[in-house]
Amino acid sequence: MTIETLKTDGASLTLHLNGPDWDGARAATLGTVSFKTPQAGTDLLQQALARVRDAGLDRVLGPMAGDTWHSYRFVSESDGTPAFLMEPANRPHEPLIFAAAGFQPVARYFSARMPLDIYDPAPLPSPAGFTIDAWDGHDPDAMLREVFALSSAAFAGNAFYTPIPESAFLDMYKTVIPLLTPELIFFARRSDGALAGFLFAIPNYAEGPDTKAVILKTYASLIPGAGRYMVHACHVAARKIGYETIIHALIHDDNRSAARSRQEGGQVFRRYELLGLKWDV
């Protein structure tokens, strides 16, 4: 990945010239955005866009630190509550600077919270063709390798997907390993033991070690129905452990998970946008 860091006294960002495909052509991406003042941000953004044009590219996405495996999205609406663990954050004027330069939303997302005491813990009917189990807490490297392999398959059809090496994925998550709670990580397995789905949830340690909130961060499956069963298992386990609130984190507006969150009583408290700009060619 080609990465350049552009920086002035009042602004900085990273420029990635080997970004994902966007409508049939490679896009650049602008990530790690920090604009201390509107003027400093405007000036640096124009410098970055000129660099993109000089590289022969006609489209750019932002904020995105190279790909969707890394940090991306601006907060576009908020109820003002503090950011949860691993949530993107930005200054209010930063997305406005992008908009003034011609960027428009290309994808929208939200996070919702739900009190766990309203969730029905009654068991679901026995699943057909797979089982759901919590992680046993052993061999986190092996667990992450399985998750990487399934993620690569499950997310390959998503917009703006870019493959990354397994080593890069492991490097991203090795700092998170000490924070993991095995009872909040679930796997769906076929009858032969092959991984068919995973769910990753983590306590919201941004609130401190005694947090009463858990974040349902990511889940994916390769077989119909497994996602529903893993989500149910996560809600039931979080409530049993003593958590009071679950955060349905960073869900694409058009994803099936969005409808599921609403059905379960999730209340949106934050919205996000990924922005894009194309030039006429």
Model-derived features: where do they sit?
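A conserved beta-strand-loop-helix scaffold within acyl/acetyltransferase catalytic domains
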Residues: M1-A27, G31-S34, G137-Y219
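Short, solvent-exposed loop/turn segments at secondary-structure junctions
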Residues: D21, G66-T68, D253-D254
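A short, internal acetyl-CoA/4′-phosphopantetheine-binding micro-motif in the GNAT/acyltransferase core
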Residues: G31-A40, M64-W69, I215-A226
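Conserved acetyl-CoA-binding loop-helix of GNAT-fold acetyltransferases
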Residues: P38-V52, I223-K240, Q263
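Transmembrane-helix bundle segments that line or gate the permeation/cavity pathway
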Residues: V52, G56-W69
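Active-site/acyl-donor-binding loops of N-acyltransferases
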Residues: Y72-I118, L184-F186, F198-S221, H232-V281
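Acyltransferase donor/substrate-recognition loop-hinge adjacent to the catalytic core
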Residues: R91-A159
